[in-house]
Amino acid sequence: MMEKGSNLVRERAARAWERHLSWVPTLYLLRGIPYVAILALVPIVLNRMGVSNAVNLFCCSLALIPFILRPLLGRFSRQLTDCHHLILYAEVLMGLIFLAMGIVLRLKVWLPAFLFLFYAEALAAAFHDVGIGRYFMICSERRFYQQVPATRAAATCAAFALALGIPAMVGGNLEVIHRRIPMAWSTVCELLGGVILLLAVYHAVVLVPLGEQLVRKRNDYKALLFEDLRKLTDRRYFRFEMLFLLLFLLPEGFFYRVGILFLVDPGSNGGLSLSPQELAFTQGTVGAFGMLLGCLLGGRCIHLHGFRYWLWPMTLAITLPKVFYVLMAYTLTTSFSLITLSVFLEQFGFGFGIMAFVAYLAHLSRGYHPVMFYSYCFALAAIGITVSGALSGILADYLGYRIYFALLMLLSLASYLAAAFVRTEPIEGLKL
């Protein structure tokens, strides 16, 4: 009976993979929207609503905690429902929460309820992420995160345009039309919720139910956690792998959201005073395009020459372009062309450099139980980004943008330290 069920799952997975181009782009597009909301959109909304940068970035960083708990959520979700329904339930929930966030923004006392819904959105997004990982792994016959990388990268980068570029443009225009900031960003949240619900309906039609078996027995999650950690720590280069995961993106955690707020903050606060419409063009359109080009080029380079060959160039690419923000902070340039070019170069370098992290994460996820190892490795990386993001707003408020970005260049040494100690012998010639 169990063998018959396994054969049925394989048949349905093969049928789903035959038309994967009908669901992979939209699924990864929707997967990227919550990340963009956490990293960029909600910080902008809170900034426009008058919340200080320190409180803003601290609260937004807490939304990454569900992604740190991803391994436990993955274990727990296997007892709730199959990955097909998990994806659909999470998408409907995310859409409804965005609609509720839009309603809450119209209230006089809005911040506590808004943050509660925001954290609920992050939790639903983490479950959605788990469901996508399981569904993709089954359909691609366990070649976990090795298929259609260009399609997934393009869809994820398109999420920046859909969840940052377009909403920021709409929000800025509505601010001008209505002269009411809460009304403008309330409408943005409601429109984004509607888009998510439409994509959920589309996925309900195109995604093939796999009929996977649920885990019916009650698990001892504490015992399972220790067992998973034992398997993780038994790896030959465990310490060096964890060092890389924690440190490589640490400077980016300190930079990204502060960089966005620097662009929109008024000159009296040391910012560049871009309007939401200008931010939508620079960060949400030109920046997203630069990141997409960087990701595609980085993936191609690693495919041709391997991880070790491109590790140091990619480390330089993800750190050195931050110097443009140092220059802009000290000059307070008003040239929109120079600002846009600087954002493009920084995002291109980020897209190119992060492919080293993606490649290493893909390598660590190979072998026995790839979803489990991917979840734990992703959680470790999320810890570094969460801690750095929580501190970034406090430090930026205290030091000012000029000193903060200058110190950030020194903090980039963490990425070089991670690259120096990574053990590349076992993954030489790694292909994406």
Where are the model-predicted features located?
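C-terminal ends and interior cores of transmembrane alpha-helices
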Residues: 92-109, 316-334
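Cytoplasmic membrane-interface "Motif A"-like loop-to-helix N-cap segments
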Residues: 79-93, 303-317, 336
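Glycine-rich segments within core transmembrane alpha-helices of 12-TM secondary carriers
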Residues: 147-172, 378-389
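A late C-terminal transmembrane helix in Major Facilitator Superfamily
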Residues: 367-398
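C-terminal membrane-cytosol helix-exit motif in multi-pass small-molecule transporters
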Residues: 194-213, 418-422
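Helix-to-loop junctions at the C-terminal end of transmembrane segments
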Residues: 68-82, 293-310, 396-397
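Helix-loop boundary and gating motifs at the non-cytosolic
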Residues: 6-67, 240-244, 248-268
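Juxtamembrane intracellular "pre-TM" segments in multi-pass secondary transporters
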Residues: 2-18, 211-241
